Amino acid sequence: MRRGLFLAISLAAGSAALAGQAALGADAALAGEAALDGVKDIVLHMEDGKALTVGTVTFTSDGDSSRFKIDFDDTKFTQYFLSMREFKCIEGPEILCHVPYPYPNPRVVTARDLSWLEHDLLFVYKRPADYGAKMAHGLVYSLTMTSDGFIGKPQSIDLDEIASPPADLGTAFFTGEHRYHIQPGTRWFESVTIEPHR
């Protein structure tokens, strides 16, 4: 009798756990659909709590993936000519300049792979007093999905590594060993969010 009761309780607990996992999976899928659909604002967050909306990204669902298109707000940037190149930059305690990825970008993401979106958000920073820009001072924002968008934390990259074409142009270059940890609070913009358009 006790053995049968124990078995029944175990089966019920197992069923409840499976149901919970299924619910979590469904919630994650819904979150992924919300994050990868529609128009979102690109917002840079400063270390002092202020925020600056610098553009939008439009996601278009395409089966299990989404295509995206970024439109920067040129009024938030100043044109700079640095190291024989033209950049769109944001001025402040440091100068943050957007660096377009110089090789083909399919602009497709999935809930599990946001690398091509991250590669459309590459930057280089410099001090206002510095002459020119050192491409070794590159930044990529490592994105994590939220319920309705993304949050990204800066990681250090050396943009000189893509001065020549990577061996595999079909794979986003700045992943894994090509990224380096940054101590929180060391950069002017400490995070980026991609959130529902206001």
Give short role names for the model-derived ranges.
Residues G32-G55, K69-D74, I95, T146-Q155:
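Tryptophan-anchored aromatic micro-motifs
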Residues M1-G4:
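Positively charged n-region of N-terminal signal peptides that target proteins for export
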